[in-house]
Amino acid sequence: MLFRSLVLPALVAVTTSDADFLVMVKPQFEVGREKLGAGGVVRDPALRLAAIEEVARSAWEMGLGVEGVTASPLPGPSGNVEYFLWLRRASAQLSRERAEIAISQGPR
């Protein structure tokens, strides 16, 4: 939530219109504490999907589309799976299918 509400708006405000962004979506910080599993790990793929979609939706509202989405090949130290979004202006809005593919191809 912090990324969507504070970091992304600040990045958009200080960059040129042709800037590209490569952001890491960390579901453990996006889904809310009450939805975390043991050790702070997001195990439910549906919650991971929701985190990706929320960051992409926030980016879209700021004029950024998603050029690409992929899972990080390395899980975080606690086992969280994280995702990279390539954002840029004039790119398309993220489709659920593209996000689901990233989740299915990432670490389990």
Give the positions of each predicted feature.
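Short, glycine-/aromatic-enriched active-site segment of Class I SAM-dependent methyltransferases
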Residues: P27-D44
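Short alpha-helix
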Residues: R48-M62
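A short glycine-rich, Lys/Arg-flanked "PGG" loop and its adjoining helix->strand segment in the class I
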Residues: L8-L22
